């Protein structure tokens, strides 16, 4: 309700595919979370169509769970179908624990697309716990996803996913995309300046990122209208 009053253009509700994680993280079963989905959908429907926020069902622990271990692909698909059936505008896949690998990303996306349609899954939320974050980004891009979650300095994590680090690092992600000539609209120099602000404000938080540590390559000039072409063979 507060998000809608504030004019949020997008709202995401997390649904852990691992019910053990759901009960630990949200203190709710799948059934209880789905009840919340119905309430939010009903609330959104009371608004004029041009004022309705986009409502995403985020499928947490879609690639594995530190509490349950393996999460079956069929269970992820089942939960995606339920969220769409109840009225979510789209679903998103989240590698909460950093278990995913590139082949798994492609297979999972294809399975969910087959169930709910490509228009209902456009984004993915990745962690770099085991060093596969950007490799998974490449798999997601290759298959056609265009919404990639990340966080400045890789901040974040989940208290109920022991050992999981934060999201993929925004600074590294933007450099990766820009160096391949993909437009992000994000100024790398200004992004690095923001990192300095956060580092000063949170001196006890570990900040991650290879690009900030190594700095941009010598002679690298960003062009915000679509990258530099580095790494494209030019």
Show where each model-derived region lies.
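Catalytic cores and adjacent flexible loops of soluble metabolic enzymes
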Residues: 1-234
